A protein has these predicted regions:
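Non-catalytic interface/linker regions that flank or bridge core catalytic/transmembrane domains
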Residues: 2-3
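Hydrophobic helix-and-loop "lid/oligomerization" segment in the mid-to-C-terminal part
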Residues: 6-130, 151, 203-220, 224, ...
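A residue-level signal for conserved active-site and pocket-lining positions in enzyme catalytic cores
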Residues: 29, 133, 318, 516-517, ...
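Acidic-glycine-rich active-site phosphate/pyrophosphate-binding loop
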Residues: 65, 165-175, 290, 552-555
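Mid-to-C-terminal polyanion-binding domains and interfaces
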Residues: 65-69, 338-388, 422-426, 438, ...
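Short, ordered loop/turn segments at secondary-structure junctions
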Residues: 78-79, 107-110, 137-138, 160-163, ...
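Conserved phosphate-handling catalytic cores of large alpha/beta enzymes
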Residues: 125, 134, 138-216, 245-261, ...
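A short acidic, amphipathic alpha-helical/loop segment
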Residues: 143-147, 401-404, 512, 516
Length: 600
């Protein structure tokens, strides 16, 4: 591991500090590309306008007509947290905006596979639906959309995944990554895309006179033209014609949760969405299911952080899609009955505990399989890419295990399990996680071109992807992916690099400052503050057989530390990378270091 301090543009840090930003925060923000205080404004008026998202206006027209004509809408969702929150946002939002007949369907991960397939389209048609809406999927569903259209359904695809060479022939496509879309936030999650469609729909309904413009409202979307093209004058003219306009900001806690849990890049617009959601949760304004999930996870909603989304609530919702039925997660997020929400949250918590047990066994076996590859090569270091398969692996957990192996060896990693779908027993379904510099979906595309027929299906992003191969072709895939990785990745890329914010002055070891840092929005692409320093190790001991508890001396001051998931002892003096945390003991809160890595 190589610990590297980020470059801090001195002028940006100085300008932020002069604008009143705390010196430490100014340094952290500048290192993440922030140059002015205005960029930190997380007000709703600073959100990008829906009219910049290609297809949003057309989606609004389609949905407004469907609501006017009392048509039946059916949402087809993905089975992860982004898909569940997107489905919940769609259900709640469409009902708020006047839709009377809205249902949903989530494919079974094992039986149905991912996304809108022809069989799923048939099931939607059988419900009597008139309009099919995908959330967090659909951009690759060429055959599924065709099947839905053949059954007479209108199809609205809302997605954020990268498109393939052919786009589905949907009535409307809304995806920031589709060709010719100029929307500035290419990293918006599926739940964010659906939220933007609802904003556009509300504006269209307002333009039609269905809703009043709120009396205190100014120009829509922070002074920008409305998605209907009417502008401020049209909106003001429509006031008093219809019923009060529904508030869509009640959906922001769900948008924030799905955005963080999907590990999309937290660009400026995503950070604003997350900040707005956190603000409402901390104030106690959230769906009953979100409150219940905080309670089930033992987390304090009044002090909610992005960590809670990514490591407490998100995994509990994801567990339903991995091991059970994501309808549990969606029902939890859509019910307004607090008692029912708590019951569902407890069920999700139990499923997540089961997931942890399965994951632990799979992780240990996957590590053994990965290490056996070293022996085959006669090397003490892994291949440029790792692919492992075991007949006993559970396909609902392969993605998590791939992430663990990737973190352990700093290699692009795929973990495969046998398909449980009827008639597909000889297919292997794999989930992959990558490292910086290796675009996983592009790598799969190259493997497919070099070895036609090996990949039955594939898709995904730069850092995460999925694919299906015939069992007989697994070794071919394994070698082919490793070959692509060997060509694309050099020695520096294959060395784990931990970027930090450099040394930390002793005066910043304060609990109140730790709380300030925790309240900020951190995540993918806007990394949580991590510092690096040489420290003296006073004492160390194992806790729970798998964590290293430390007594350290940092610039002459004693401080406690903990390295979760690490058991090897540290030398007397060592450079560590660490995050700040506040630990409480006997009613007293103290700063401690959460160790992320060490140069040993």
């Amino acid at each position: 591991m190589k610990i590297v301090a980020r470059t801090i543009p001195p002028r940006s840090a100085w300008m932020l500090e002069q604008a009143g930003v705390h010196p430490l925060l100014a340094r952290l923000y500048a290192a993440r590309g922030v140059q002015t205080r205005e960029e930190l404004d997380d007000g709703l008026a600073r959100l990008l306008a829906p009219d910049g998202l290609r297809g949003a206006h057309e989606a609004a027209l389609l949905l407004a007509d469907a609501i006017r004509d009392d048509k039946r809408l059916c949402i087809v969702a993905d089975y992860d947290c982004d898909g569940a929150t997107a489905c919940a946002v769609a259900l709640r939002g469409l009902r708020l905006l006047g839709a009377k007949h809205v249902s949903y369907l989530v494919p079974d991960r094992v039986v149905d596979g991912y996304g809108l397939t022809p069989p799923i389209a048939e099931r939607v048609a059988a419900t009597g639906a008139d309009v099919l809406i995908t959330v967090d999927n659909g951009i690759a569903s060429v055959e599924g959309v065709a099947a839905a259209k053949a059954r007479g359904l209108a199809v609205l695809v809302t997605d954020h995944h990268l498109p393939g060479p052919a786009l589905p022939a949907a009535d409307v496509l809304v995806n920031p990554n589709q060709p010719d879309c100029g929307f500035d936030s290419k990293s918006i999650a599926g739940v964010g895309v659906m939220f933007y469609v609802l904003l556009a729909l509300r504006s269209e309904l307002r333009a039609r006179g269905v809703f009043d413009l709120p009396a205190a409202a100014g120009p829509p979307q922070g002074g920008r033209a409305s998605p209907s093209g009417g502008g401020e004058a049209h909106e003001v003219a429509s006031r008093g014609v219809g019923r009060p306009q529904p508030k869509l900001d009640v959906l922001l806690p769900l948008v924030a949760l799905g955005t963080v849990a999907d590990v999309v890049k937290l660009d400026a617009n995503n950070r604003r969405l997350v900040a707005q959601g956190l603000r409402r949760i901390r104030a106690g304004v959230m769906p009953a299911g979100v409150a219940a999930l905080f309670k089930a996870a033992g987390r304090n909603a009044a002090a909610a952080t992005t960590f809670d989304f990514g490591f407490a609530l998100g995994p509990r919702i994801n567990a339903a899609g991995r091991l059970a039925d994501m309808t549990l997660g969606i029902e939890c997020l859509t019910t307004d009955d607090s008692a029912r929400a708590e019951e569902l949250a407890r069920m999700l918590d139990g499923i997540n505990r089961e997931r942890r047990d399965i994951e632990g066994g799979m992780r240990d076996q996957a590590l053994l399989l990965a290490e056996s590859l070293f022996d085959e090569d006669g090397s003490e270091t892994p291949r440029a890419a790792i692919s492992v398969f075991d007949a006993d692996f559970h396909e609902g957990v392969v993605g998590i295990v791939a992430s663990r192996i990737k973190d352990r060896y700093h290699r692009p990693t795929f973990v495969f399990a046998a398909s449980g779908a009827p008639g597909k027993e000889h297919e292997l379904k794999g989930s992959g996680r990558s490292i910086p510099g290796f675009h996983l979906r592009d790598a799969l595309d190259l493997v497919a071109k070099r070895h036609p027929g090996v990949l039955l299906r594939f898709g995904g992003h730069a850092m995460a992807a999925g694919c299906t191969v015939a069992e007989e072709h697994f070794e071919t895939f394994e070698r082919a992916l490793a070959q692509v990785a060997a060509e694309w990745l050099d020695a520096a890329s294959l060395t784990r690099r931990l970027d930090t914010d450099g040394p930390l002055a002793p005066e910043y070891l304060r609990v109140d400052l730790v709380d300030t840092l925790h309240r900020e929005v951190w995540g993918q692409g806007f990394a949580p503050p991590t510092f690096s320093e040489e420290v003296e190790v006073i004492s160390q001991r194992l806790v729970g057989e798998k964590h290293l508890a430390l007594k350290l001396r940092h610039k002459g001051q004693p401080v406690d530390g903990i390295w979760f998931g690490h058991t090897e002892p540290l030398p007397p003096r060592v450079v560590i990378a660490f995050r700040l945390d506040a630990d409480e003991w006997q009613g007293v809160r103290r700063v401690r270091f959460l160790v992320e890595g060490a140069e040993i």
